[in-house]
Amino acid sequence: MLDLKQTNRMLRKLERFVDIIEPMIFEKVGEPGPVSAFATLERFHCIPEDSLFDPIEKGYKWGEEFGYCWFKTDFVVPDGLGGKDIFIRPHISGYEGTLWVDGVPYGNFSTKIVFTGHGNHYCDLLKKDAKAGEKIAIDLEYYAGHSYKGCHPTENNPLLTYDFSYEGIDICVKNYAIQEFYFDLRTLVQLVKNLPESSFRRASVINELEKVFKEIYQSPDDVDRDEFMAALERAKPYLKKALSVKNGDDAPKAVLIGHSHMDTAWLWHVGETVKKCARTYANQLALMDEYPEYKFIQSSSCHSDFLRRKYPDLFARIQQKVKEGRYEPNGGVWVECDCNITSGESMVRQFLWGQRFTRKYFDFTSNCFWLPDTFGYSAAIPQIMKGCCVDYFLTTKIDWNDTNTFPLDTFYWEGIDGTKVFTHFNRTHIWPDAEDLMTYVAGTPSNDHSCIKDKRVTDTRVISYGYGDG
């Protein structure tokens, strides 16, 4: 058995090992055919015609403020990849991008938010259960971004550059063994970091991690690939044993659902919001193809109407997922509205137009006023909600207070006329992993002020995970 100093050193090495194997989840197996590009300032809502594209090579430069660049290619599935899930990883710099597969928007790429050395959504599903000989049409739409001086008066916002480049496209497969080991080990390392040192659970996890540490190689460069993978396989049972321990019935619970908050008009033109909605919601459908258990909630009927008008094929696919009960168009209002200076009539119209749209196009009546991103709340909201057949209220930012903290996160809110609505504060901008769930649900030794406030009231918290704004 290791002493305390040795144990801490082992845990640091395992934490580093998590970062080492993360890039190994996707393995390059090829490249697509010749690539052509088309740079433009025009906002297209469909793929531009072929005559506008010119052939390019690696090193191609593009970019100007408010500019877009489209990249066109295809990939023929070789016999060796038949029956496998195929992924695509572009090496294209830019602010954000959309993946189109066989003529329809199917995913998004984000380099603006960096995690583990690369942007989020850096490698997207291209084709589920691909067929040998199948030709896949690939179009990539990238946005260069823009400056927004003056939005933050205290910030010195220098002139941005838009010098972007194309450095190739990789076709990849996923190493599911690496992925499983990565998430299992990451979960257990986070548990150890956030449980009290006096915890018996923590001690039992450390015992299993010590066995894992003795089996694995610290770097894939230490041995050949087969031996590296064999070592992971030998260590796997110890991870599974540690993860098999269940919490008791009185343990707190987290309700997880995917969500991408979308500002209708903030640091960009509304026309760009339309494209943000397309790439974001298309990506949710791709995630549903990859993960059958995945569910997503979208607020703001206005955003659905953007897609109905500009991306009708994508809108039809969303309608199908709503029928399946996997895509929930629940928010109650037309847009997530201001609640400080708006009039009562205006708020009623928000619910009227929001409910009218979801009933007409999704056969869905919203039961929740989903409003995570507002900075104030009219005392008339409960009365207006109930009058519009909306029973539940969810918000977030009042729970960010660090000076006069709000004492509850689940309660009945009573309005000016005595009307009550069931209210819950969720948490956003977090990962659905062990560290964040412990922090915002149960609490940790280093953070006991972000968790469920009054544990006599509830043992459950909603966690909506995912990044927003396209």
Per-range role (PLM):
Residues 61-79:
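Short beta-strands within extracellular/lumenal beta-sheet-rich domains
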Residues 68-74, 85-87, 135-137:
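Intrinsic-disorder/low-complexity, polar/charged segments enriched in Ser/Thr/Lys/Arg/Asp/Glu/Gln
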Residues 52-57, 71, 80, 234-240:
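Short linear interaction motifs
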Residues 2-47, 92-96, 106, 128-470:
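Catalytic-domain carbohydrate-binding cleft regions of carbohydrate-active enzymes
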